[in-house]
């Protein structure tokens, strides 16, 4: 259940009552269908299927009435005969709840708490204690400004800047904290920005005007050292810039902020203040290393993301410090778990420098219990009893490595976000969360039926940790809007944490608000040293072309590749993904197989999973392998189709995209749902025209018909025809392929690069650091509430997770 922000208007109830008066028989027939299914939860498609049945038997008026809007926006219905309660979501982030008594035909509006209490009765009525712990974070956020339009969700920093600049514009006294903020800047004992010669805003403005006049007479490239002494006498310290030109820009920005603040100027100025010198990135679970780890348990995309992230972040920090005229060396630490039984990886080394960086290291800290260090790997679902001690130990190790405290901490996934919360609370630093995936949304009804899952997954711990970390974070970044607030018809991952219940444990009536300005969309890119356009001939890895040709054309049928391509002059339609039901590779193969026009125009090559069922231990993958073999036989795909087993060499995969581009082919991402779509970004970065699912992140990455194409995997025939149309057009006009390829690249360069990501992240860290300071947003009340919840609930739940036992040596 995902239920959230309650819009307390009676409109939904009114619509139900109006329909009851106007179409009593049809509505009773519909509600009776729901009730006849017995106690349970109805999903949106169940709700609408029953409506279709009523419509086909004469309930036309019901379909045309106002009640249709209610049912179309219903996210679930709870059936407890004779009652049906419906959670209605008119738009992202806004919820209402109604309950209908089918026998009495009465309608009532429910509060979040009432709805959740009713839902709990599904669990055999065993949790009927009237005194259940309810968590409500809304009162703590009453003073925090927030937008109310769904389109504003995920643009938190823009909203915050508008709010801050308007306060400063209306009330000049609100500029005082900015003065204090600039005067309080120090790093390793060095004063930056302003010294104590400047005690008032008036003095600051006159000094800035004097500095502006002085700098305007100097060449723009004059080094700071040539006027540093004069500036210091006036009260200005290092940190304004490395040259007269850059310092003058900064002074103009601050003068504008002091005279007539606007959101853009404020953000630019705050983003340029030297605030971030040392960063900690927390990612405890899995085998975190740089080599021989991908494919090990709990070890995949998150590690690739973080390694690309920190390389870009270090480059940005070095560049900013140079521009700020500071000679400090930045440092980034990735704090993860040290695993003595490292399975041939480097995960048993305490410190490891990240390749391609100068100042970024993996710092590994072991999990400990009363028996000492835990030696073996444990699942991400079993880490909860170790995290508190891990955070304490990590704090000491971080202090030793940095010779002080970090300025900024980034948590990753549920465990990393909880540890980041503990560390940021202890150190008083700005915290950013990245979820990567929120497990609650992956397992339907894992909240209401949590006891079913708890022995294996310990979701009671994980959901509790998620709520604590979300509310403790200063800001949260996501890759897409849908991750926060879903779409018109689907609930966002964060949105599903706004209201839910774990019967017998606690009830969340207001957990997180998707309208909170802490949410920001900052999309990652692809590593441009690996993924770059096919046209950049000098950088191409031509030495790999022989092995790639074998991969695609070698006639031998083995466990690395099966199938063959008779006509190599045809373009290649390409896809690469895990072989599971959601990624829908077999769906793509079937759509291709059934479309004679597409088969005539292109060959199909897919990289996915194993082609031998004996090699897989995953039931879902085995089913997909069997389905793929069946499709090859049924549709006689030999000669037009090649199936290559999963490839983990990223450098070779990058060249494979470009190799496909050389054939004037295209990339397809056919998933039923894709949270972000990194392969879409990789393919577009290599210059491949891309067709990708409309369900999830790719719908935001691609502008349909401009930088690529959206396809709906639930309508495979339409998708296949769209792809065939593209290749027919390319056949008639080869320049069409080049145009789509170039527009795809343009889209990437505008929005989806690690450089854009790191610039944005550093700016956010500056703005939220300032916001925390000027509004005194230490959130003391919230933090006390969270502390109580952590100690009284999370710690007790963590004790229920069995401790791992190392095998005797």
Swiss-Prot record:
From the UniProt record, which GO molecular function terms apply? sucrose synthase activity
Q: Its Gene Ontology biological processes? A: sucrose metabolic process
UniProt catalytic activity: an NDP-alpha-D-glucose + D-fructose = a ribonucleoside 5'-diphosphate + sucrose + H(+)
**Keyword Cytoplasm included in the entry's annotation:** no
InterPro entries assigned to the protein according to its UniProt record, in alphabetical order: Glyco_trans_1, Sucrose_synth_GT-B1, Sucrose_synthase_pln/cyn, SUS_EPBD, SUS_N
Ranges for the region named GT-B glycosyltransferase are 275-753
Q: Does the keyword ATP-binding apply?
A: no
Task: Please tell me in which tissues this protein is expressed.
Answer: Predominantly expressed in the leaf tissues and in caryopses.
The UniProt keywords, alphabetically, are: Glycosyltransferase, Transferase
Q: What class of enzyme is it?
A: transferase
Enzyme Commission code(s) on record = 2.4.1.13
Pfam families under this entry?
Glycos_transf_1, GT-B_Sucrose_synth, SUS_EPBD, SUS_N
Q: Which family does it belong to?
A: Belongs to the glycosyltransferase 1 family. Plant sucrose synthase subfamily.
Q: What does this protein do?
A: Sucrose-cleaving enzyme that provides UDP-glucose and fructose for various metabolic pathways.
- This one is known as Sucrose synthase 4
List the source organism: Oryza sativa subsp. japonica (Rice)
